[in-house]
UniProtKB/Swiss-Prot annotation:
Descriptive protein name: GPI mannosyltransferase 1
Domain of life, source organism: Eukaryota
Family: Belongs to the PIGM family.
Source species: Dictyostelium discoideum (Social amoeba)
An example molecular function term from Gene Ontology annotations: mannosyltransferase activity
PANTHER family: GPI MANNOSYLTRANSFERASE 1, PIG-M MANNOSYLTRANSFERASE
InterPro entries: PIG-M
Pfam families cross-referenced by the UniProt entry: Mannosyl_trans
Record keywords, A-Z: Endoplasmic reticulum, Glycosyltransferase, GPI-anchor biosynthesis, Membrane, Transferase, Transmembrane, Transmembrane helix
The keyword Endoplasmic reticulum is annotated on this UniProt entry: yes
Enzyme class (EC, first level): transferase
Pathway per the UniProt entry: Glycolipid biosynthesis; glycosylphosphatidylinositol-anchor biosynthesis
Subcellular location(s) of the protein: Endoplasmic reticulum membrane
UniProt membrane topology term: Multi-pass membrane protein
Amino acid sequence: MTRVKTVMTNENNKYDFIFKGINLTKSIFIVGLVIRLVLIVFAEWQDANMLVKYTDIDYVVYTDASRAVVNGLSPYDRSTYRYTPLLAYLLVPNILIHPAFGKLLFVICDMIIAYLLKGILLERFPKITSRTLLICLASWLLNPFSINVSTRGNAESVIGAMVLASFYFLTKKNLTLASIFYGLSVHFKIYPIIYSIPMYLYIDENFFSRKPSEYTSLNNNFKNIFKNFFNKNRLKFFLISAFTFISLTFIMYLIYGYIFLFETYLYHVIRADNRHNFSVYFYQIYLNTPIVETVGDLVGKVNGSNMIVALASFLPQVILLLAITLVYFNDLEFCLLLETITFVAFNKVCTVQYFIWYYSILPLVIPSSSLGLVQYIILFAVWMGSQGLWFYSAFNLEFLGLQTFWNIWVAGLLFFIANIYILVKLILNHNPIKVNQYLKSK
């Protein structure tokens, strides 16, 4: 009978799965890295030789913004650059060294995410089996979406690494670094602000004495939430993360002015995407003129109907996010996953890059789920299948010039239903008792 190996925690928190003399844990890191590097090289060839480019248009925007910085100009001189200037600074080597530098940076962030996932899993589930750990890591490192998004030159892995770094340092009881990385992640992209309340509640007055493996939703006590709402640990997290965000934002504002605030943050509140959008609000957005594209358009060009959509779309998000937080904040990884899926599914703009937001968290909930590998595959098939009609309709629109906007909207509705179905399945199969079975050894 084969003996099931479990995590043998040592000072380095190393745990490797060995199969027939092969270290599969290390191998999967190597394979994931090699696949990404090969695709970066392939992208150079395809971009030079084929009509359809492999590289994402966003990467061209990043690079143009970095070129502006090198030339002493503002990154916002490049139209459609709607990110923090820090991203343009990071990609200056695109201009000075090689245009593919940024893709390599994003791939490195992919690998950092995998490292952080492993560290969090070992802290959170001390008795996790080596097979389960391997599956968790493979679900990120071999995920075709994470591979594609980074190698095409989208920066979502940078933000994902920051969010997971914050969670990682929470499990390591380093509240200062956790706060800094969280504030940095919100500065880079505003969406991690949805994690603020669950993270705040997770840091209770016993934060430094409780092991990461002792937190489950079975321990939720709503009376204690308000009784110790302003404990010193929570206030430290709030003050340091707020200082990090505000100081970086203020510095960028001093350098670039209002255009920085608008393009980096305000634009995303009123953004309307009438083409590459899975959202259930897509058709309403299509039927109305996009809200605004530049700062100069802001005055007098905000369409009233789209503004209503922009504001109304936040209401179901806020209600659901608060409900999820109150129920699951002690199962922080599960809470963050549910919040991310909910936020993306109900958002007025939903694109492929957003999927990385929850794919980088998904591996953390696999050990506490009653779903088996086959069930996960079925859910993935449902999720992918629901996108088939959307991609078909989008292809007809983009490449054949057919008017398929209504078809795209219907496909978006099916995709929304698929996301809700997956969300319900995850909730029904989340097992706090199973979590406890992983916890008692440390």
